[in-house]
Amino acid sequence: MAQAVAAYEKVWRDYLSNKCNLAERQAIAHLQSLAALDAAERTADTHVTEADFAYIAGATRGNDVQLLERALKAYGQHLNLIPFNTNARRMMAETYMRLRRYEEAFDVFDELLNMLSDFKEDEIGELEIAPFRLRHDADQLELLLGCGDIKIGMADSMTDAIRFFRELADDLDRGAVRVDTDSVSQRIRRTRVKSLPAEAQARLYLHGYNRLPPLKGLGVGARSLHGLCDRAFWVEKDPLAHHPKAVWADIAEKYVSERLVVVDEFLSADALEELRRFVARAPIFRTMRAGFLGSFPADGATHVVIRKLAESLRERLPSLLDKQPLGLWWFFKYTDEAPNGIGIHADPAAVNINIWLTPDEARVRGGGLTVFKRVADDRSAVADYNHEFASEEAEMVLRQQLEEGGSVHVEYRANRAVIFISDQFHVSEPFEFKRGYENHRVNLTLLFGDRLATSQAGVAEAPHAAARDTSADDLFG
């Protein structure tokens, strides 16, 4: 058994370290062994192991449909036996994404949101907490109350939650609440709920921390936040229809020659306003970073506009995206605690599209993006080039090395999209936005394809190959 576990972990490790050929060979060999098992020998563990190997083999073979379909079948068999395995459910959603079965993937992510929100009181201790998150959630609940989105009869309990979240945030800031310092990181500005006194933990659970609030249209057992959007309306809309066809040919050509393209007025006006409304009102910002909040697919970032955007982009940029499905996306919302934005990093994908959503009127200064010409080493694992730095000094050392290779700076502008090679290092420009919940800087990032998939990506191969000429191999030992 120990040998089987070690073999399984090695395949994943090789895959995540971009040793794709090695991971593929091992995954196929293990799949052949699993195929020899008869029905009586198959268990929940063998089903999920088969699913993972089929997923890895399918991904490394350019999203091979037969292998990915095999993965879906095996994930389904596993979940029939162990329905609450959130990791298996997440992998099922990611498999659907590789097959471009986006609607089914979004439904599975919605199921994950429901499962992850339905936790017991003794499980709250493992959640992260920070004053900026508490203030954000209080402000959002206040907005939802004012908009009439909270169910009738629940206003008083939500008002109590708002008051408690703000009081606890203030207490944490001034040190009035005892916190287990072993669980605290000043650099990342957050801690675990379990580091708080038992009374505070109990009150957080009572007031629904990190759970879905009682929204109208979100009934018992509801699987998503679709009540906050008109899904039927947006399914029929194209968020890019306002651009003439010639624009997309220019974008594709410029991407090949310059490796970075800026597109203004990217989303249609109604799609932009819909996403702004969604990020303001939807309780989806459940992931924390150093002073800012993230919303990923399993957090509820599954508005149908995102799916329609992915489909529309493939139609308009086939040379870039025909073989590069949407793999991951997120919203980042920067509170007043994060005036520096996100630190230097690269993202594990082929094509990155970053879209700024917050109106220009909210911006005082800064907020743009610097994209360095160097890319992450092919041999590096994701954690090597996408992580929170232990200190400002460590980040500055990397920045100085990257600047030697050159960079491009893009100024902030609402509804501006920046399209670039995803594993080029990039960093936010420090900024100041007006204070207030409605003025938080928000961006939507879409990642398409795999880092090493560009050999299958037609015209997109050329700029990525050029980027490799200035690889950051020397930045990581």
Residue locations for each model-derived region?
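Residue at a conserved register position within TPR or TPR-like alpha-solenoid repeats
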Residues: 14, 54, 61-62, 96
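Short coil turns that delineate tetratricopeptide repeat
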Residues: 39-41, 83, 117
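Non-heme Fe(II)/2-oxoglutarate
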Residues: 198, 222-324, 328-339
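Canonical positions in the second alpha-helix
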Residues: 30, 34-36, 77-78, 111-112
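Catalytic core of non-heme Fe(II) oxygenases with the double-stranded beta-helix
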Residues: 323-328, 332-477
